[in-house]
Amino acid sequence: MDPNVLTVYKSPFSKVRIGKNYDGGYIIVEIPNVSYTTLIAGGICNDISFEEEFIDKYPDVQTFAFDGTIDQLPTENNKISSFIKKNIGHKNNEHMTNLHDIIDVNERIFIKIDIEGGEIPWIHSLSDDQLNKFEQIVMEFHAPYSEREIEVFNKINKNHYLVHFHANNCCGVRNHRGVIIPNVFECTYLHKKYFQTVELNQDAIPGNLDMKNVSHHDEIYINYPPFVHPSSVV
């Protein structure tokens, strides 16, 4: 993976934290007057704090929650349209879904994914047209450092800009091609249609909305490219 595929840009709008403190909360962009039709949440495990708060914020959204490792939602929530006991991946079978059927019949999708490494083959399975339906993508990546990941990040970057990057302090860092990168990190992508001008991110990481994923581990601080830039000029 070329570290430059993780270039972080300045968001054109303000951001907000959604979900519980520490692990389980994510930073999203507050797009003015946005109307999401669909929230797809993958890898919810025992925490639906993000989904509950998102639905409260966008009450008209239809929500699909996926996790093959649990039998039911951790708490009852009638606002979640559907819980599917399947993991998200690159194919469809009894235990896995690639989500193509839901993506193909919906527009203005918000997707939030934490599927413990399954994100790479899943993105590989998507077409550009399917990715283009995502208004925002919130995704955790798990050690995506082989050459096969370059295509994945290039595919996302075709229609989206990375506007928020946070190191999950669970698992340390590595020196990858001369850049210190977290082994696990959270990304928020915003569709390029929302940008009138494009500027590089100059804000230090973590930001004031971020919280440690693991409270008793040290935070991981980042103040260098491609994440933080001395100038906003692209």
Regions found by a protein language model. Name each.
Residues 1-40, 47, 53, 84-85, ...:
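Rossmann-like AdoMet/SAM-dependent catalytic core
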Residues 46, 65-73:
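Short, polar loop motifs at secondary-structure junctions
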Residues 54, 71-81, 129:
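Short loop/helix-cap segments at secondary-structure boundaries that form the rim of catalytic
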Residues 56-62:
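Conserved S-adenosyl-L-methionine
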Residues 62-67, 85:
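Conserved SAM-binding motif I beta-strand of class I
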Residues 86-90, 114:
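Conserved acidic residues
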Residues 113-119:
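Switch II (G3) loop of P-loop NTPases
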Residues 121-155:
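A short alpha/beta connector and helix-capping loop motif
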